[in-house]
Amino acid sequence: IAEPSSGLRSAATAVACGQIVADGPLADRIEQIVSTGHATLARPVLRQLARTDVPIIHIGDRSTFPAVAGPNVKFVPAVTAAGRGDENWLRSWIESGDRFASALLAAEPLTVARAVWDAAADGLLVVGSSNPIRDLNLVAPVRLTGPQVLANRGLAGIDGTVSTAIGAALTFWGRSIALMGDLTFLHGANGLLIGPAEPRPDLTIVVLNDDGGG
């Protein structure tokens, strides 16, 4: 299960709509969890990481683990696979996620998030907090090469997203797109003030009408 900004959604084992699958019957059969990075987006994933009834191995330290770490949580610098796992187990997760993904693509405004992801293609995609990043978490495709994704941590903070996108675009070699909600855009609109001697980025900003966030 990989968040949009993790850089791992293109992995061959990535699960679409993983947060939905992790809240279903397959989750009851989990025997061990391995996590890396700092998961923050989906409550079902956070609930899995807060479990005390299965061993959890986190690649990293406590600063990147999003739950209270009980005695079942082990922090390690790296892991090595002991061998190939049960391919039927992986297939059941992938097929379940793909079914959810197909159903969700017909829903607005999720189609907007998917269209922006596709438009970014091999470029840079900067994503604002609240609904946009969560929409992408549902509909951004997996097991396919996608854009480089940047998203500010915290997800409750929206100030400075426009400036973040401009700064990132200025350092990127290709086209850049930013997707953000209406309130996020308003809170960062002063970042659009670019002086006459300052460089201008190749940046498209897409503002999602999400009624001030969700």
Indicate residue ranges for each PLM-predicted region:
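Gly/Ser/Thr-rich loops at beta-strand to alpha-helix junctions
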Residues: 1, 38-41, 129-134, 156-157, ...
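Generic beta-strand/beta-sheet core signal
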Residues: 2-3, 36, 59, 126-130, ...
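Active-site diphosphate/adenylate-binding microenvironment
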Residues: 90-172
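Glycine-rich, acidic loop regions that bind phosphate or pyrophosphate groups
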Residues: 2-100, 195, 209-211
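Redox- and metal-dependent alpha/beta enzyme cores, enriched for Fe-S-associated oxidoreductases
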Residues: 1-11, 123, 133-140, 202, ...
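A short acidic, amphipathic alpha-helical/loop segment
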Residues: 44-49, 115-116, 138-139, 191-195
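Structural motif
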Residues: 32, 124, 175-177
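Thiamine diphosphate
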Residues: 140-214
